[in-house]
Amino acid sequence: KKFNYRIISYNSMTRAIVLGGSRGIGKAIAESLKSIGMDVFAASKNDIDTSNLDSVKKFVQIHNQTDVLVLNTGGPVAKGFANITEEEWNKYHNQLFLGFCIILQNIKINDDGYIFLISSSVIKEPNSKLIISSAYRAAFSEVFKILSKDYAAKNISCINIAPGLINTDRT
């Protein structure tokens, strides 16, 4: 396969939206983007709760266009399959899957922009104690992969970052 690499140039990009931007890896990303002169909206759970679809819909009405979008959210606590409740399945379906779908349907990414998905290493190596995270992050990663071909026509890069364990208050 031949890969077409382009040099990342932030000169023409001015705006970024970072979900989960108030702590952890999201905060580090937001601070890095600010350090290169971008106007960054580092969204906290008070700004958007991706597990609450009404919150997602309100957010995209206000924040509906950007140069860089970082899809990032925390995940469920470690729990065995038999102990997961129906409410937890529904909450994390929205938080890790459907909320991101609604965001991508409603936020315009400017041509030559970037979408970063901060998923998890569980998309490649599922973890029996993180079954909800493993399932929904892998499912959305597949949607993201398919959509990346459509975004490529506008020279929008879609990058899925799948980190391992991050030292935050969740770990």
Roles of regions detected by a PLM:
Residues 22, 30:
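N-terminal Rossmann NAD(P)H-binding glycine-rich loop of SDR-like oxidoreductase domains
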Residues 23, 74-77, 121:
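Flexible cofactor-recognition loop at the NAD(P)H-binding site
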Residues 43-54:
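Rossmann-fold cofactor-recognition segment
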Residues 70, 99-107, 143-144:
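Hydrophobic positions on the long internal alpha-helix
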Residues 75, 82-102, 116, 133, ...:
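Catalytic Tyr-X3-Lys loop
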Residues 79, 156, 165-171:
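Short beta-loop-alpha junction of Rossmann-like oxidoreductase domains
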Residues 116-140, 144-153, 165-166:
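Catalytic loop of short-chain dehydrogenase/reductase
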